[in-house]
Amino acid sequence: LKRVTRMLPALVALVAATACAAETVPAPRAQATPAAQAAAVVVPAAVTPAPSPSASPSAAPAKKIKLRIADITPMGEKTEKVGVGFPIIVTFDRDVKNRAAVEALLDVESEEPVEGAWRWVSARKVIYRTKTYWKPYQKVLFTARLSELPGNEGAKNVSRRFAVGAKNVSVVDTRKHTMKVYRNGKLAKRIPISAGKGGLIRNGVDVYLTTSGVHLTMGKKAVETMTSSWMGVTDPKDPRYYKEEIPWAVRISDSGEYVHQSAGYYQYLGRSNQSHGCVRATPAGAKWFYQITQRGDVVKITGTKRKLQWNNGWSYWQLNWTQWKKGSALKS
């Protein structure tokens, strides 16, 4: 394994909602399920035994803890496999005052060497991205040596191992109304689609247009409830109201974009763009795509005038490598 370590400062921007939004628009984040907890290996720092009643009053005080990790995304190797574009997202339990010192204690090792760097996106969150996609079918180990942070000697060191699966890269051409899915470099399937039709302007942004850029798959549901609440329409009597149960939904942004089975309107698939921003697919194509999807798979969308923002979901590949590294607290 080759150790790769880097880091970064932060920006977080608001993203326009898309009409295809589900009831719960925020990005899916890893929860501390039993399986996830099992995937995180906790390495305790040295512990000083408690003094006995006869101990001297000058015995060493309990070691201090001033920083812990609250969450790591994605899950570990025992819970899921991840795609070749996957980021490592680390959230701390409080604001990090000395980012450079903390970043220097975050290590990433991969079986297939690749350059990577951290980028701070908030006072508590830092994200690791590689310069090029991870190689498929390998293990990646993340370790946080927080007990080495001055004044934090009582903290526990934490590690998590990730398993990279197949290299899934999908290319959506909104002008030709097709999605080509490549697995390990070979074309596996061509799926007729219908993308966003445009026509609804919010704050100068046409939110009915699908965003063009490099997306990452963030999560998936066999059935997702999608409603009109994103635009403030909650009254069933309103002609604009809708609430639909959509099969085979794979999330690709924080602005409510999914690749999913079309709810009817099959006559438009492969012919014209008629959605509210999502990528609609045939029932068979959507189910197949859902089944092969791993979080961190790459979905490249082309052909629209609405550009994907780098901080819309996991769209970190929208920044070039020089831009990405500027977010690190460690200056080379």
Describe the predicted segments one by one.
Residues 170-197:
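Compositionally biased low-complexity segments at domain edges in trafficked proteins
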Residues 197-216:
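Electropositive
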Residues 89, 103-105, 143, 190, ...:
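Extracytoplasmic/secreted envelope proteins and their assembly/folding machinery
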Residues 166-167, 209-212, 227-332:
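Exported/periplasmic cell-wall-interacting domains
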Residues 96, 146-148, 185, 223, ...:
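Short, charged beta-turn/beta-strand-edge "cap" motif at the junction between a beta-strand
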